[in-house]
Amino acid sequence: MSGGRLFVIAAPSGAGKTSLVRELLAREPNLRVCVSHTTRKQRPNEVDGRDYHFVTVPAFEALVAADGFLEWAKVFDNYYGTSRGALAAAFGAGHDVILEIDWQGAQQVRERTHDHVTGLPGCTGIFILPPSRAALAQRLRGRGTDDAAVIARRLADAVDDMTHHAEFDFVVVNDDFGQAVAELQEILAGRGDALRSGRRALAPLLADLLAPPSAAPSGGGGPPPRL
């Protein structure tokens, strides 16, 4: 498998990962995103093949049985997975590739990119954080697509998602959208050392985001990534 570099981007739902990736794709002509498969119900503003490949549970399970996924996971009772074929096609064309996946998928990708049988390059992991717990809760409620029980469940699960931030090479805070995009471009260009060395400055933010729900401000938290 020839081609460019592999970047894995994960975040709790509501952190703005998808918007950031779309802006990166608009600015970086050699960058491609590997569109995931999912059994989740398609939302009104989503396009099949652009946002996800929407498939049935039997179709997804058939791909799992055929070893058709580089990684897959079950999140919020729905399956998500990255197709080996789609990834191979992007690398075959010489593109750099982004995977928008959750921390579970990122763990699988890290393991398999060190497996010489797959022929995959090593991957660079990037975790997106919201600027605060309250901001994350507000973004989730602002979607208007989920009821209060679903939002509460996602907010409760966000703490667990964000405890995995240290497993990634870089952490980017999506407070100012333009700045976050610029930081991602620096990482893609191989100039992310300043971000790596500045992670200690995130300690106060992480203390807020990772506090138990009872100790957190009333604003809330967030959920698993690929929603």
Q: What is each of the regions a protein language model found here?
A:
Residues 25-34:
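Post-Walker A helix-loop "phosphate-sensing" segment adjacent to the P-loop in P-loop NTPases
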Residues 38-107, 223:
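ATP-dependent small-molecule kinase phosphotransfer cores
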